[in-house]
Amino acid sequence: MFWQKEIETMPRKELEALQLERLKWIVDYSIRNVPFYAKRLGEAGVTAEKIKSLSDVTYIPFTTKADIRDNYPTGLFGADMKKIVRVHASSGTTGKPTIVGYTRNDLNNWADQVARIAVAVGVTDEDIFQISFGYGLFTGALGLHYGLERIGCTVIPASSGNTEKQLMLLRDMKVTGLVATPSYALYMGESAKESGYPMSDYKIRIGLFGSEGCTPEMRTQIEKVWGLFATDNYGLSEIMGPGVSGECIKRCGLHIAEDLSLIHIYEDLGYSRRRQDRQRVHPVHHLPVPARPRVRRAYGGGVRFL
């Protein structure tokens, strides 16, 4: 099932040509609009004209977390504030939060990106979704909210907490889809069983869970207590938010929106590798986001080849 079938089923050769075109564009745009990148890429001798293939990405210097902190709050923005219509921020648990801005076009692309991962797991315009993420600077709630609305779903912005009221809405509104963290979905399920209402009063058929890790055991528990189809998705506020990747109905791993994100896997960036050697770090370019371009951003996330 596809939301933007032409893009999502694009032949590999055409996709890589699009990635190259967008990579060159974002490099040129960043040099012209972000002083930090004008200096950093200039020192490295990188220009859009010198990028002839996707493998040339290795000539581009990494953008690190320290670079983000040093340019707080808007030093890496690539658009004037009058063009920024939304601001989100990371939690800032290790220091100052990362401020991310969105132009109107960014928000439009983001909604389609989220719509893709939702449709891929069976969401339709007949679904009624309750979003039990906390609203605010966190990208998760509003990201899923507008993506689901884009599909045509009815969206209930319940936010987090007040579990008794959450359960009442699930029952009374005959909610068919739930957005929550896996741990809160489990807690809600246990609370529902203790509430005195039969579980048959709940009509949830699908869950879009994220914002924290979900073990296979947790997924099994969630599906058992709710009788729903549990799915996982992934995103970072720095790139866009939820929608960077997500499962499909086969649940064979997370599918990346490769027309929008160029992800490369590296082994020796100086990060400590945990557990098995198959884990790597992944630098990312989010290709078409002019509000705050990220050029070869090293996120340090672990990945595993399946």
Language model features: what each stretch is:
Residues F2-E14, L18-I31, P35, I151-L306:
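Active-site glycine/GP-rich loop and adjacent strand/helix microenvironment
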Residues V114-V121, S191-S195:
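Short internal alpha-helix immediately C-terminal to a glycine-rich phosphate-binding loop
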Residues T94-P97, G136, P182, S237-I239:
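Gly/Ser/Thr-rich beta-alpha loop segments that engage phosphate groups in nucleotides
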Residues V123-D127:
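Short helix-loop-beta connector
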Residues M1-A89, T94-D112, V119-A120:
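Nucleotide 5′-phosphate-binding alpha/beta core
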